[in-house]
């Protein structure tokens, strides 16, 4: 019997290393885990591919999807809309694949209302100075955008206690090991093990 996949919510202030950690995690045994590809109205960044990094849509298209109740969760962030497909998430979990939602605290609250068993992981930078350094080093945003992200960071970080796990991304390898440990621990819960190994367990209990 295939165990149902786990839904992981991963949030962090922009520049904390969330996307890099998820990307590194998915390189190991990618068949049993995947990141949800969100819909967004923001413009693609250099190197981003439609359908791979995001489903890029217009605001009119996004609002139509909201009306159709097509999103598991959605939120407006920095003037752009982001949303997660309800149908895709449910089918992927049913197939026994862990799904990672790369979303902010607003989206996390919506998901928890629909699926309380979702596991929340919040990633923190070691300091505000390091966070600003990382944002600047990415070379993706203007000084104005970076200033806006730094101003928003404190508000985002204030929701850290709404999550089940907290990872400090000071050393990348250590943070990745912590993330792997969280994923593994959820696979080893009694519910997960019963679904995955029910026949074996019943055999052990047989007279």
Swiss-Prot record:
Broad class of the protein's primary localization: cytoplasm
Matches recorded under InterPro entries: GK/Ca_channel_bsu, Guanylate_kin-like_dom, Guanylate_kinase, Guanylate_kinase_CS, P-loop_NTPase
EC number in record: 2.7.4.8
Coiled-coil region: none
PROSITE patterns given in the database record: GUANYLATE_KINASE_1, GUANYLATE_KINASE_2
Keywords: ATP-binding, Cytoplasm, Kinase, Nucleotide-binding, Transferase
Enzyme's top EC category: transferase
ATP-binding keyword on record: yes
Catalytic reaction(s) noted: GMP + ATP = GDP + ADP
UniProt-listed Pfam families: Guanylate_kin (PF00625)
GO cellular component, one term: cytosol
Domain Guanylate kinase-like: residue ranges: 5-184
Transmembrane helix found in the keyword field: no
Gene Ontology MF annotations: ATP binding; guanylate kinase activity
Record localization: Cytoplasm
UniProt-listed SMART domains: GuKc (SM00072)
Chain sites annotated for binding ATP: 12-19
Biological role stated in the UniProt entry: Essential for recycling GMP and indirectly, cGMP.
PANTHER family assigned: GUANYLATE KINASE, GUANYLATE KINASE-RELATED
Family under the similarity heading: Belongs to the guanylate kinase family.
UniProt protein name: Guanylate kinase
């Amino acid at each position: 019997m295939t165990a149902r996949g786990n839904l992981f919510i991963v949030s962090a202030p922009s520049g904390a290393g969330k996307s890099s950690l998820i990307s590194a995690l998915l390189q190991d045994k990618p068949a049993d885990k995947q990141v949800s590809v969100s819909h967004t109205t923001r413009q693609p960044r250099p190197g981003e591919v439609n359908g791979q990094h995001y489903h890029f849509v217009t605001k009119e298209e996004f609002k139509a999807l909201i009306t159709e109740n097509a999103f598991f969760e959605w939120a407006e962030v920095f003037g752009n809309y982001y949303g997660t497909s309800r149908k895709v998430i449910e089918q992927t979990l049913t197939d026994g694949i862990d799904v990672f939602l790369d979303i902010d605290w607003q989206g996390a609250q919506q998901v928890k209302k629909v699926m309380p068993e979702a596991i929340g992981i919040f990633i923190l930078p070691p300091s505000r100075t390091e966070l600003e350094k990382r944002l600047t080093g990415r070379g993706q945003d203007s000084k104005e955008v970076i200033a806006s992200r730094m101003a928003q960071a404190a508000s985002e970080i204030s929701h850290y206690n709404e999550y089940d796990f907290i990872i400090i991304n000071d050393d990348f390898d250590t943070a990745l090991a912590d993330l792997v440990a969280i994923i593994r621990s959820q696979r080893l819960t009694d519910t997960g093990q019963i679904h995955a190994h029910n026949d074996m367990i019943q055999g052990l209990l047989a007279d």
